[in-house]
Amino acid sequence: MAALDGLPPLRDVIQRHGLDARKALGQNFLLDLNLTQKVARTAGALEETTVFEVGPGPGGLTRAILALGAKKVIAVERDARCLPALAEIADHYPGRLEVIEGDALKTDFEALAPEGPVKIIANLPYNVGTQLLVNWLLPKAWPPFWQSLTLMFQKEVGERIVAGEDDDHYGRLGVLCGWRTDARMAFDVPPQAFTPPPKVTSTVVHLLPRENPVQCAVANLEKVTQAAFGQRRKMLRQSLKPLGGESLLVKAGIDPARRAETLSVEEFCLLANNL
């Protein structure tokens, strides 16, 4: 990659700017530029596309996205120590990298989105990754402002994202992702690819928005999944008691003796629509 974009190796960048990944910020820097290119390629063609990135750190993934031809990258970085390293990348790619210093959880990405196609590609900080994904899945207007999400998570979170019914990993996150997206795990990334190495394997997940998801009120779906999976080993007649229990299930045509992990996304939407 250094040969491709003419920028110095990431290890040199980190040493020169005194960057150490901080646990409090959920940081693990991905330094293998072959891997950052693999992540960026998972998002598909990037020409004429604006890419949002969260937590770019020293900019390894940022460089890969730009080298693969993205029209522009808008990167949200909370750690001010990383800004000088990102400024060097911005100088190398004039007009194509905008860095916003701030908290991604408080950032209105839709308001920042320009006209034209938008993709989100990120090695998400572990401590905010799941909440960011949920935020991107919950807008009332659908299809959303983004064309795809290509995101790195701890593998256990990735398994929850893609899980369907009768899977041990199936839960509220799997229902939400299955309702509004077609999600797949693309590839795993071993701990030694990062600095410092996390204790767990990571995985890259690629999500595409469903054009016509089942009509369902988000707030009701949240209530139903929270109650059902909050007591996942109990029969639904018991776990859904606060929401109507057996009468709700009968109205939706669902056997009250079933358990949460056996319900499809469509059946959860049916329950939500009968609340």
Curated annotation (Swiss-Prot):
Q: Which Gene3D superfamilies match?
A: Ribosomal RNA adenine dimethylase-like, domain 2, Vaccinia Virus protein VP39
- Keyword Transferase on entry: yes
Q: Which family does it belong to?
A: Belongs to the class I-like SAM-binding methyltransferase superfamily. rRNA adenine N(6)-methyltransferase family. RsmA subfamily.
> Broadest EC class?
transferase
Q: Which of UniProt's keywords are assigned here?
A: Cytoplasm, Methyltransferase, RNA-binding, rRNA processing, S-adenosyl-L-methionine, Transferase
Q: Which reaction does it catalyse?
A: adenosine(1518)/adenosine(1519) in 16S rRNA + 4 S-adenosyl-L-methionine = N(6)-dimethyladenosine(1518)/N(6)-dimethyladenosine(1519) in 16S rRNA + 4 S-adenosyl-L-homocysteine + 4 H(+)
EC numbers listed for it are 2.1.1.182
- Mind giving the lineage of the organism this protein is from? Bacteria, Pseudomonadati, Pseudomonadota, Alphaproteobacteria, Hyphomicrobiales
Which InterPro entries does its entry note? KsgA/Erm, rRNA_Ade_diMease-like_C, rRNA_Ade_Mease_Trfase_CS, rRNA_Ade_methylase_Trfase_N, rRNA_adenine_dimethylase, SAM-dependent_MTases_sf
Q: Which domain of life is it from?
A: Bacteria
Q: Where in the cell is it found?
A: Cytoplasm
Coarsely, its chief localization is: cytoplasm
State the protein's purpose: Specifically dimethylates two adjacent adenosines (A1518 and A1519) in the loop of a conserved hairpin near the 3'-end of 16S rRNA in the 30S particle. May play a critical role in biogenesis of 30S subunits.
Single GO MF annotation: RNA binding
User: Could you tell me which Pfam families the record lists for this protein?
Assistant: RrnaAD
Recorded protein name is Ribosomal RNA small subunit methyltransferase A
Would you tell me the Gene Ontology cellular component terms? cytosol
Binding-site residues, S-adenosyl-L-methionine:
N28, L30, G55, E77, D103, N123
